[in-house]
């Protein structure tokens, strides 16, 4: 059985970690380097840094944060936010990142996935997908012909990919996009449910399972973690390979080690 990974996520704004709900209402959660050291000591398998403001003038801040973190933490570090070119990949990797996460730039210029994977290797290229349920009122709608429709407890829906930090819908079906990024050379998918983000009500298992089933890539489930049962569900029912979480760790509701011990009780292999 493949070992499942537990990955704390640090959303970084102007050099500080922040956390919100449904991508809004951001609260300060601490210093990224200090939190990274804590999660490393608690047994995190990897870390994800997402520079959520990522405008050009903030780029130097994230590079500095990555450098300082990489000097003190020795687990794989994925960095994303505002990365648009192969040169951006190179700068962040040189600063100490192990993988680069791209979202908006992947949608806008899909060939970046191919180019980066050929230069740096597929293991370096993580495609992040911010996904929202799009509920259907008319199942006969002509516009649904190229969409994968799911029956959920709240009605029929398809899953839409969003860009620019969840601010803009693309009309792209998440399942079809996942297949495309795999073909282009992505090595992993970081899959965030915008509906579940920050709610602590559990991961969107319909979404996670559907993406897992339709690609051969490792899937990191993200959005909605509130307790260890949610993580177990993401692994068992959602078929995820890794689980990302933020709030429950940042606000000391549990530790990475606490989560792993509970997960192991459910016969799921984790690194303790």
Curated annotation (Swiss-Prot):
Listed GO biological process terms: L-histidine biosynthetic process
Q: What EC class is this?
A: lyase
Database matches in Gene3D superfamilies: Aldolase class I
**Record's keyword annotation contains Ubl conjugation:** no
According to its UniProt record, the EC number is 4.3.2.10
Q: Which family does it belong to?
A: Belongs to the HisA/HisF family.
Can you list the disulfide-bonded cysteine pairs? none
**Superkingdom of the source?**
Archaea
According to UniProt, this protein's pathway is: Amino-acid biosynthesis; L-histidine biosynthesis; L-histidine from 5-phospho-alpha-D-ribose 1-diphosphate: step 5/9
- State the protein's name: Imidazole glycerol phosphate synthase subunit HisF
Active-site residues annotated for this sequence: 11, 130
Q: Which reaction is this enzyme known to catalyze?
A: 5-[(5-phospho-1-deoxy-D-ribulos-1-ylimino)methylamino]-1-(5-phospho-beta-D-ribosyl)imidazole-4-carboxamide + L-glutamine = D-erythro-1-(imidazol-4-yl)glycerol 3-phosphate + 5-amino-1-(5-phospho-beta-D-ribosyl)imidazole-4-carboxamide + L-glutamate + H(+)
């Amino acid at each position: 059985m493949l070992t499942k990974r537990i990955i704390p996520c640090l959303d970084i704004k102007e050099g500080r970690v922040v956390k919100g709900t449904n991508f809004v209402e951001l609260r300060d959660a601490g210093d990224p380097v200090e939190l990274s050291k804590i999660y490393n000591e608690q047994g995190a398998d990897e870390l994800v840094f997402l520079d959520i403001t990522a405008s050009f003038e903030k780029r130097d801040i994230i590079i500095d944060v990555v450098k300082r973190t990489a000097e003190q933490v020795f687990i794989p570090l994925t960095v994303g936010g505002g990365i648009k070119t192969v040169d951006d990949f190179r700068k962040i990797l040189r600063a100490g990142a192990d993988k680069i996460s791209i979202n908006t730039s992947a949608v806008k210029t899909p060939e970046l996935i191919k180019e980066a994977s050929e230069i740096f290797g597929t293991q370096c290229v993580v495609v992040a997908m911010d996904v929202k349920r799009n509920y259907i009122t008319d199942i006969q709608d002509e516009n649904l012909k190229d969409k994968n429709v799911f029956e959920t407890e709240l009605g029929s829906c398809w899953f839409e990919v969003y860009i620019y930090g969840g601010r803009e819908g693309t009309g792209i079906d998440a399942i079809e996009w996942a297949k495309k990024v795999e073909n282009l050379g992505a090595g992993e998918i970081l899959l965030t449910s915008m509906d579940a983000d920050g709610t602590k009500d559990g991961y969107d298992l319909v979404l996670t399972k559907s993406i897992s089933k339709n690609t051969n890539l490792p899937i990191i489930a993200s959005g909605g973690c509130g307790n260890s049962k949610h993580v177990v569900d993401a692994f068992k029912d959602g078929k995820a390979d890794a689980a990302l979480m933020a709030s429950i760790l940042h606000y000391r509701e549990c530790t990475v080690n606490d989560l792993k011990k509970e997960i192991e009780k459910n016969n799921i292999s984790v690194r303790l």
